[in-house]
């Protein structure tokens, strides 16, 4: 794992570190030394400062989301609790990647006696990243299930998704993902671990896609049924659909940002010596940047899609330190 960092390689997990280390040797064997010394098959270098900067931005943004949800009682609903879980996962993924940049720098600059300790720290960070990835996927799936219940079981929703039940679900998600993440790193020498992670990723996406196909095919029918009920049923149903659309955007961004990373893993398993696969895998650092961008983009989506959350952001950022600035800005 140490040798894989000499060309500025910043790997996000121990098994990915190992795969990137083999990248150049595979290119050399199959394509000749001239190809591996430069061009498409040379590892793309990204400055460590970029990783650290994105990590800090993600940390501040997602802390803001967590504080806003905790502060505003109007946001104490199942969907926002799951969003809070997603924000924690995003924050840990991005901050851990930024922290690993520092660890890798220390790994390359310290002597042999201290490298073993640094490697152990790196493995702990890898476990956090892997656990957070799994928690992100599970949190997105939980939000999808929550939106499904709000649309198809609107009248029974509050009996089904109680706050206590949501807290238990989130606790179980993080407990299971933490154990799984640690096991993935412990047994990272096996290709079966990568295959398992890829399978989990696409299985979760398939489940969410199935829920959404059903939701959007039947949503209009349920809106018509709710509309004939007294009170504000139609308004509530419209808000539920808005939440479903918000999650659609979140899932879309998640897929765009994470798909290249998982495609890298698929190529590493299936065609590690194919010239096109090697060329794609040489941009691994770029895929890590995309992953961190996902953690930066998600809080912006929350703010754009939720007026209540946006209002709370404004109160936290402006009103406390700057007094009446929020009152002034609200007039315009």
Swiss-Prot record:
Residues involved in Ca(2+) binding: 100, 122, 126
Subunit structure: Homodimer; disulfide-linked, also forms higher order oligomers. Interacts with GNAS. Interacts with ATRNL1. Interacts with MGRN1; this interaction competes with GNAS-binding and thus inhibits agonist-induced cAMP production. Interacts with MRAP and MRAP2; these associated factors increase ligand-sensitivity and generation of cAMP.
Chain ranges on the Extracellular side, renumbered to this chain: 1-43, 107-123, 187-191, 272-280
Protein name in the entry: Melanocortin receptor 4
Keyword Hydrolase applies: no
Name of the gene this protein is made from: MC4R
Family, per entry: Belongs to the G-protein coupled receptor 1 family.
Positions where lipid (S-palmitoyl cysteine) attaches: 318
Keyword Kinase listed: no
Membrane-traversing stretches: 44-69, 82-106, 124-145, 166-186, 192-215, 249-271, 281-304
Disulphide connectivity of cysteines: 40-279, 271-277
A GO term from the CC aspect: plasma membrane
Keywords per UniProt: Calcium, Cell membrane, Disulfide bond, G-protein coupled receptor, Glycoprotein, Lipoprotein, Membrane, Metal-binding, Palmitate, Receptor, Transducer, Transmembrane, Transmembrane helix
Organism: Macaca fascicularis
Record-linked InterPro entries: GPCR_Rhodpsn, GPCR_Rhodpsn_7TM, MC3-5R, Mcort_rcpt_4, Melcrt_ACTH_rcpt
Stored SUPFAM superfamilies: Family A G protein-coupled receptor-like
Protein task: Hormone receptor that acts as a key component of the leptin-melanocortin pathway at the intersection of homeostatic maintenance of energetic state. Plays a role in regulating food intake: activation by a stimulating hormone such as anorexigenic alpha-melanocyte stimulating hormone (alpha-MSH) inhibits appetite, whereas binding to a natural antagonist like Agouti-related protein/AGRP promotes appetite. G-protein-coupled receptor that activates conventional Galphas signaling leading to induction of anorexogenic signaling in the hypothalamus to result in negative energy balance.
Residues carrying sugar: 3, 17, 26
Biological process terms in GO annotation: adenylate cyclase-activating G protein-coupled receptor signaling pathway
Location of the protein in the cell: Cell membrane
Residue ranges annotated as Cytoplasmic topological domain: 70-81, 146-165, 216-248, 305-332
Name of one Pfam family that matches: 7tm_1
